[in-house]
Amino acid sequence: MGYSKLERNLIDLMKEEQAKLGYRKEAVRLYYPLSSLNHLFEAEDSVDAMQERLIHFPEDMTAKLGMLAVTHKGDRFCFRIPEEGSEYVHEHMGANEFIKELVEMLWQHGTTMEQIRALFDRHADGVICENIDNGEFDYLLRFPESVGDPYYYCFKNEGCHIIYHRFLPEDYADFDF
């Protein structure tokens, strides 16, 4: 279960990166704190135990992403995904991927929360929208569980544009906003 969650998260982050920066067939490095990896594996591993867990990846995962290399400094883990992983993600990103549409919308100055909400609503019924006042963000939007997008999308109106960050629910809870 944990490896499939990790694979999905790695692919989702790479899709987001490619939506923002464009595609290049190159190796990618993604960083995770130990706490996030423990959430993905539903574990309470130490740094050493997590490093041991990440030595061998399932064959179906490496068939998609290539031979991943994992290192760590302290409790910060680095995943190096080879260029074939970048290529796999690029080839499997749909033209109407939600994250791609969101990034393109937020590139535009003058984008409103109403437009962002409409984008969410075009992708699913029952979108949850909360006003939040935690000093970091103004709004939290998320899809219902049935949609299969587990992330909490947090938005901040910076005046001339809106920024966002997305979190897995467990990571969002760790911030204790």
For each predicted feature, which ranges?
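Positively charged, polyanion-binding regions of nucleic-acid-associated proteins
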Residues: 2-29
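Long, charge-rich, low-complexity intrinsically disordered regions
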Residues: 2-3, 91-98
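Charge-rich, solvent-exposed alpha-helical interaction surfaces
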Residues: 9, 13, 40, 53, ...
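Short glycine-rich, basic-tinged beta-strand/loop micro-motifs
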Residues: 24-44, 98-106
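Charge-enriched amphipathic alpha-helical scaffolds
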Residues: 28, 38-67
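Charged low-complexity interaction tracts in eukaryotic proteins
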Residues: 60-94
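A cross-family detector of function-defining hotspots
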Residues: 112, 118-153
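Intrinsically disordered, low-complexity regulatory segments enriched in Ser/Thr/Pro
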Residues: 147-177
